[in-house]
Amino acid sequence: HTGGPFSSLDFTYVLYNDFLKYDPDDDQWFDRDRFVLSPGHESALLYSMMCLIGWLDIKDLKEFRQLGSKTPGHPERGLTPGVECTTGPLGQGVANAVGMAVSEAILRNQFSEDIVSHYTYLLHSDGDIQEPVAQGAIALAGHWGLSRLIGYYDANKAQIAGKVSRSDTTDYKMFYESNNWHVQEVDGQDREAIRSAIRIAQMEIEKPSIIIGHNVIAPGCATMEGNHNTHGAP
């Protein structure tokens, strides 16, 4: 699955480089920010970040999708340092992230912001948002006003069998707004726009936030940019 990691790269890089709060010496630090990669098939992107932090090494990347490695095809909680939850089934990670944001809100209210104060960041794909489990979780997050939840929608308009428009023409900006989310739209390859959008989302105190990153699959790949076949091709 090469195309998706390319289109999700700019957001993920900006998040880890400029915003995500974590301890490189302790991946289980209790007040770390959480990041959930809902499209688990984009695991190569996540493992690359783990390698740059130092939680994985080049040898682990070379063993990608090999039996017994720390870098399976889909991220597994408890196997790979820095993986917050096991993802793969589309939509599941969205619900996982909402659950983490609920936990943060409960603990923050119980123990105060001096002890618990972190964000839950979510990245989801076109396929994730089409799943009922994701849509139900999104509705719940908006209803409860989980303002420490910040999502990024990698809208690259491609799925493994073809263009998204073949099967779905939902207006997801309107969908999110109708579920009480703060919505921003950016160019998914514009890192400064992404930085600005995350800063604005962090200032929102009444609603969860979603940043819709308009993109194409496999951006920058000279012969394959925009080609849905990169979704599942090596």
Region locations from a protein language model:
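Flexible loop/turn segments at secondary-structure boundaries
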Residues: 44, 129-131, 158-161, 192-194, ...
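Cofactor-binding active-site loop characterized by glycine-rich and histidine/acidic residues
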Residues: 5-144
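A short, conserved beta-to-alpha structural element at the edge of catalytic cores
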Residues: 141-168
